[in-house]
């Protein structure tokens, strides 16, 4: 409906210009919003105020010129009103909203799909946790955000690839190997003063015990450095297998698993450094090599090769992001923890140095999750009945609740996640509240099979059948869905889908509270119309939940 109204407004403005009423032919695209108060109509535009400066006229005079020249051959409008300083309010014929029902019935799972991203290739890299320990709840929120972003972009016509960057090179991997080796030595009866900078978790002891119990390697006959390196590879691979399983249980599937070590194995890091030395972007100072990021918007230049000859993570990240764009992606979206916010400027500088538009590289920063139980903060320890890992949370509350709640607030805001609330089967639980509507409608549809309905009902008839205010509100909410999806994709804000689904569920409850779908004393035509209406609600809830990676149960 917005598109039709926008065309009507634009034509009216140009007609007013041709008549000499509006001096300028600079007519902007009309913006249309739903007024907060229903008394102000179905849609409202402020185009008259936007045009006032160019037209050198009072906004109300511009609004009058537009309204006087509106052409409505199909009688879409009941009336128009000019309000306040120059708002134009439009009141639509109620039967028009019934077109939404037919559109959803026709499109089904494809309702909400658009082609705004057609021809654009996008990579979403997310989670990318170091393979030095199990995924924690913060990684879980990042996984939910990244996966939902990828689904939204795909729904809007982008060609999307999901990628996980495996940080399997550098100091943290050697530290992992040393930690495992030392725990192995403890099992062999050696007294070890375990370093504080090694990994302390009990999972390291479990890895060492596996090596011993399963006799996976003859570490005792190896030189210590060789044993540490073997332990590093074994531990990293084992932990990575666990990460993959945790993500699978969380319904997250990556298309590509990209190894940092591969950038060293194929000389990508060395080639990138040599390239930027030739271009003058890298210089030497104090025995180290520095990348000129300050000239490109960073607060200072950054070291890429230390004075001991070892490369920094920034060096491999430069090579990695160059590789991304070399693979033909038009946009690269990285989902990071909020604690990496200081890293954004240097990476944008690197992308700029590679010769790509800084804006083609976007970073989504995800803030921490505070776990609660019945409103009380939960101690974050590895063992003993408290929770740290994503697997622990998913095992207790399920993937549906975890994903929905992780996405229930903007990722730039900290999130309180109450484990007990996530298990409740009441309206307090946000995912249960939405899923219950889907299940309730499935139950209504099942009962309808034994109920007299009009089988020859035709939604193409221009006949006002659904005219109760709750029915119209529900159809308006359904009509907003494609716009919500596009908005969430454009802004990279998947929480908008959660907000929308809760609003739609609320609109359904208001409708169902006052109006029975299957009712003995109503006409078969009205029964069929209402049955189709709730079917479209079920369809849109199913579509929205699918974008979030949440199931739509038929019974609860």
Curated annotation (Swiss-Prot):
<dbReference type="InterPro" id="IPR009080">
    <property type="entry name" value="tRNAsynth_Ia_anticodon-bd"/>
</dbReference>
<keyword id="KW-0436">Ligase</keyword>
<dbReference type="InterPro" id="IPR005148">
    <property type="entry name" value="Arg-tRNA-synth_N"/>
</dbReference>
<dbReference type="GO" id="GO:0005524">
    <property type="term" value="F:ATP binding"/>
</dbReference>
<comment type="similarity">
    <text>Belongs to the class-I aminoacyl-tRNA synthetase family.</text>
</comment>
<keyword id="KW-0648">Protein biosynthesis</keyword>
<feature type="short sequence motif" description="'HIGH' region">
    <location>
        <begin position="129"/>
        <end position="139"/>
    </location>
</feature>
<dbReference type="InterPro" id="IPR008909">
    <property type="entry name" value="DALR_anticod-bd"/>
</dbReference>
<dbReference type="InterPro" id="IPR036695">
    <property type="entry name" value="Arg-tRNA-synth_N_sf"/>
</dbReference>
<dbReference type="InterPro" id="IPR001412">
    <property type="entry name" value="aa-tRNA-synth_I_CS"/>
</dbReference>
<dbReference type="Pfam" id="PF05746">
    <property type="entry name" value="DALR_1"/>
</dbReference>
<dbReference type="GO" id="GO:0005737">
    <property type="term" value="C:cytoplasm"/>
</dbReference>
<keyword id="KW-0030">Aminoacyl-tRNA synthetase</keyword>
<keyword id="KW-0067">ATP-binding</keyword>
<dbReference type="Pfam" id="PF00750">
    <property type="entry name" value="tRNA-synt_1d"/>
</dbReference>
<dbReference type="InterPro" id="IPR035684">
    <property type="entry name" value="ArgRS_core"/>
</dbReference>
<dbReference type="InterPro" id="IPR001278">
    <property type="entry name" value="Arg-tRNA-ligase"/>
</dbReference>
<comment type="subunit">
    <text>Monomer.</text>
</comment>
<dbReference type="Pfam" id="PF03485">
    <property type="entry name" value="Arg_tRNA_synt_N"/>
</dbReference>
<dbReference type="GO" id="GO:0004814">
    <property type="term" value="F:arginine-tRNA ligase activity"/>
</dbReference>
<keyword id="KW-0963">Cytoplasm</keyword>
<protein>
    <recommendedName>
        <fullName>Arginine--tRNA ligase</fullName>
        <ecNumber>6.1.1.19</ecNumber>
    </recommendedName>
</protein>
<dbReference type="InterPro" id="IPR014729">
    <property type="entry name" value="Rossmann-like_a/b/a_fold"/>
</dbReference>
<dbReference type="GO" id="GO:0006420">
    <property type="term" value="P:arginyl-tRNA aminoacylation"/>
</dbReference>
<keyword id="KW-0547">Nucleotide-binding</keyword>
């Amino acid at each position: 409906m917005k598109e039709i109204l926008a065309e009507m407004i634009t034509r009216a403005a140009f007609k007013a210009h041709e008549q000499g009423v509006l001096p300028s032919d600079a007519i902007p695209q009309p913006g249309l919003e739903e007024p907060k108060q229903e008394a102000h109509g179905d849609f409202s535009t402020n185009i008259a105020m936007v045009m006032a400066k160019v037209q050198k006229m009072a906004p109300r005079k511009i609004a009058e010129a537009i309204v006087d020249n509106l052409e409505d051959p199909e009688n879409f409008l009941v009336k128009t009103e000019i309000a306040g300083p120059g708002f134009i309010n439009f009141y639509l014929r109620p039967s028009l909203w019934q077109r939404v029902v037919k559109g959803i019935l026709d499109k089904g799972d494809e309702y909400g799909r658009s082609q705004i991203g057609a021809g654009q290739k996008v990579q979403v890299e997310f989670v990318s946790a170091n393979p030095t320990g199990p995924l924690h709840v913060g990684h879980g929120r990042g996984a939910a955000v990244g996966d939902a972003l990828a689904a939204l972009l795909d729904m809007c016509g982008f060609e999307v690839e999901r990628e996980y960057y495996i940080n399997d090179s550098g100091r943290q991997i050697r530290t992992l190997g040393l930690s495992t080796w030392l725990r192995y030595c403890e099992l062999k009866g050696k007294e070890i003063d375990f370093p504080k900078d090694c990994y302390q978790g009990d999972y390291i002891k479990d890895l060492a015990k596996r090596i011993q119990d399963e006799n996976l390697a003859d570490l005792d006959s190896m030189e210590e450095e060789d044993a540490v390196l073997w332990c590093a590879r074994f531990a990293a691979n084992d932990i990575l297998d666990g990460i993959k399983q945790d993500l699978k249980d969380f319904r997250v599937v990556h298309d590509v698993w990209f190894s940092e070590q591969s950038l060293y194995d194929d000389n990508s890091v060395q080639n990138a450094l040599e390239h930027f030395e030739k271009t003058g972007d890298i210089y030497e100072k104090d025995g180290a090599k520095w990348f000129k990021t300050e000239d490109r918007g960073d607060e200072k230049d950054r070291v890429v090769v230390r004075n001991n000859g070892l490369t920094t993570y920034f060096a491999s990240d430069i090579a990695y992001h160059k590789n991304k764009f070399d693979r033909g992606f038009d946009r690269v979206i990285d989902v990071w923890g909020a604690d990496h916010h200081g890293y954004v400027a240097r990476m944008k500088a690197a992308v700029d140095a590679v010769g790509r538009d800084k804006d083609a590289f976007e970073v989504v920063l995800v803030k921490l999750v505070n776990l609660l139980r019945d409103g009380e903060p939960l101690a974050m320890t590895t063992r003993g009945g408290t929770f740290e890992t994503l697997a622990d949370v998913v095992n207790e509350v399920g993937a549906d609740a975890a994903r929905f709640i992780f996405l229930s607030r903007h990722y730039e805001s900290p999130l309180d996640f109450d484990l007990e609330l996530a298990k409740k089967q009441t309206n307090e639980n946000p995912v249960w509240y939405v899923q219950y509507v889907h299940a309730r409608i499935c139950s209504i549809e099942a009962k309808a099979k034994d109920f007299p309905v009009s089988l020859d009902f035709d939604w193409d008839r221009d006949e006002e059948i659904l005219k109760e205010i709750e029915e119209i509100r529900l159809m308006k909410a359904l009509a907003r869905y494609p716009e919500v999806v596009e908005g969430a994709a454009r802004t990279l804000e998947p929480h908008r889908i959660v907000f929308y689904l809760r609003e739609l569920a609320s609109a359904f409850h208001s409708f169902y509270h006052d109006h029975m779908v299957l009712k003995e004393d109503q006409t078969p035509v009205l029964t069929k119309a209402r049955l189709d209406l709730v079917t479209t609600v079920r369809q849109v809830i199913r579509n929205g939940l699918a974008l979030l990676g949440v199931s739509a149960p038929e019974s609860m």
